[in-house]
């Protein structure tokens, strides 16, 4: 489940890649389901010169950054997950004060240099709003408003997941069909 969301986020940001290379495995003793992956999206359509690496494991004792971007003029690093699930588990409801608002300790950090000086600035994420997804479906069904997300949008992600499994099994780069 987590892998599908990470792949979808990468496709939304960078586009569908020309090819994929993946290492997917069960690394827990006695494990029955994949619990580790590293996936490289090669030459994504919206940013063909960007190197996209996705990774996750259930066995991480220390958090890794959720997002890391490096460019010629700086880097951006972001830790932490969306707060909404944790908020629900703590009894908060959508629309209440601080719903989906992350702690400052996991704000994104932008590191740049200006006039030879290092400039580091923290940026909060926007508060999450999963309920907006369902509100949009309601408005679509009742008022014929357009859907913000359509079912066809999942097809590239499904194709990438299948190609990632093939790549991992065969140990090779797999081209993505159009």
Name each model feature, range by range.
Residues 1-51, 55-64, 68, 80-82, ...:
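Rossmann-like dinucleotide-binding domain that binds NAD(P)(H)
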Residues 9-12, 136-140, 163:
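Residue-level signal for well-ordered alpha-helical scaffold segments within enzymatic catalytic domains
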